[in-house]
Amino acid sequence: MLLSACQNVKQTQLVLFDSLSFGMSPKSFEEVFGEASQVVEEEETAYRDTWRAEDPYFYKTGRLFYHYEQITLKGYTGRARFTFSKSHRLEEVTAHFPVTSKAEQQALLFNLFQTVKKELEALPDYQSMATDTVGLYDDGYRYKVKLEGKRKELWVDVYPTEDGSVGSQVDKYTIRVDQFLMYQ
């Protein structure tokens, strides 16, 4: 009875990923999205003697990270990381879209701003949206979406990144899109 009640809970759909939603299990996620390039289980450090921080050891937290190196979303090619909680439910998504120049980065950023905003407004449980600036130079946006019947807000960050230490022009400029649910 409890299992069927949990399955009937309306889940929040992801933006840019048509058939994915927060709260999915890894099994149902893999059925929709396919096999990952790499799956990593998070490890943390703890100390047997916490007072002196001596005798460290590693333990697995249970959180899973699914890495996809070659994905195509709405005509854009990039890579993505999906984070599953300790209870193995999808809780966060990060997508990176590399471009070759600053001008191409700005054009893609503008297109993603419009695409993400349209998709958010089209969500079935969309109620309202607030927008903040994010990024080093306030050149990105954080969309905070209130959803009907939910205590959590859907937050989507879209912002440019630039890695000056990278010699390759392909990996220097990227657009990053983060999605997660946040208690408000």
Model regions and ranges:
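Short, recurring structural edge motifs at helix starts
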Residues: 13-19
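C-terminal motif of bacterial Sec signal peptides marking the signal peptidase cleavage site
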Residues: 3-5
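An acidic-aromatic pocket/loop used at catalytic or ligand-binding sites
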Residues: 98-100, 141-184
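Post-signal-peptide N-terminal segment of Sec-exported extracytoplasmic proteins
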Residues: 24-57
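Bacterial signal peptide processing site
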Residues: 7-9
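Long, charged/polar, surface-exposed segments that mediate recognition or autoinhibition
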Residues: 69-140
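Structured segments of extracytoplasmic/periplasmic soluble domains
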Residues: 23, 32-39, 83, 115, ...
